[in-house]
A protein has these predicted regions:
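General structural signal for secondary-structure boundaries
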Residues: 1, 33, 55-64, 203-204, ...
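A short, solvent-exposed beta-edge/loop patch
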Residues: 3-17, 23, 27-28, 121-229
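A generic structural signal for short, non-catalytic loop/turn and secondary-structure boundary residues
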Residues: 40-44, 81, 147-148, 187-189
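Short, solvent-exposed recognition patches
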Residues: 52-183
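Short conserved aromatic/hydrophobic patches within beta-strands of well-structured domains
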Residues: 47-48
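Alpha-helical transmembrane signal-anchor/signal-peptide segments
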Residues: 25-44
Length: 229
């Protein structure tokens, strides 16, 4: 038994050293996304009040968030009409900027809950479609604070594929190997984190002009559903 443990640990160490050597010698691929998120997302919709916000509540907090997440572009824009409010948050990382797990560390399950929100519902890898086009599977949750309940769909897109946050019993020591299995050896692909939140349910929102334009714009982020390999 002891010998088996030693062999297993040795294999893991060799794998880690090999990966570090690979990532040091092989440069990350060139980014394919060249547009500014603020230009890409709708900013003028008849009958809707649209506003851009800092990535957090204050410039200081926004600076800290930016330093922590190290994104290359980001946008936080809200759309309001009567009693309907939609929040759109998108962050972008060029290849090699951040690890997949680090970039995905600001999901509502972490940031929102840490800041006082209660998670009432959660679903993983949820089918999501618009205008007969399928998106990569989404993450879904319902979060509430001070009687303000928000329905949230979010995606962490890695090289065009959704990164799932479904919990498993696999120890964290194998997390890098799981990423390689799912995304290939080059773990330095373009990443987007997209979050859509609203005080209304999404079946209602899909009939609105704002949601229609938002979802149409998101196709440019390579979020179409990919064939399972």
């Amino acid at each position: 038994m002891k010998q088996l443990v030693i062999i297993t640990v040795s294999i893991l160490l060799v794998s880690v050293i090999g990966l570090r050597t690979y990532f040091t010698l092989v440069p990350p691929p060139e980014p394919t996304f060249q547009e500014a998120l603020s230009d890409l997302m709708p900013d003028d919709i008849k009958g809707w009040r649209i506003k851009d916000h800092d990535m957090a509540d204050s410039p200081e907090a926004s600076s800290r968030v930016s330093d922590f997440l190290k994104f290359d572009d980001a946008i936080f824009r809200t759309y309001e009409q009567y009693d309907t409010a939609i929040g759109l948050y998108i962050a972008y990382w060029k290849p090699g900027t951040a690890s997949y797990r680090w970039a995905g560390a600001h999901t509502p399950d972490t940031c929102w809950v840490v800041n006082g929100w209660t998670r009432n519902e959660r679903a993983y890898s949820v089918p999501f479609s618009h205008a007969e086009r399928e998106f990569e599977p989404a993450e879904f949750g319902v979060y509430e604070m001070n009687s303000n309940e928000q329905n949230v769909y979010f995606w962490h897109i890695v090289g065009g594929r959704a990164y799932s946050y479904k919990q498993t019993k696999v120890p964290n020591i194998f997390s890098a190997l799981i990423d390689i299995k799912n995304f290939g050896l080059n773990l330095r692909k373009e990443q987007f984190f997209v979050r859509i939140s609203s005080n209304k349910d999404f079946e209602t929102l899909k009939s609105t002009e704002a949601m229609d334009q938002i979802l149409e714009a998101l196709y440019a982020l390579n979020m179409d559903k990919k064939e399972v390999l």
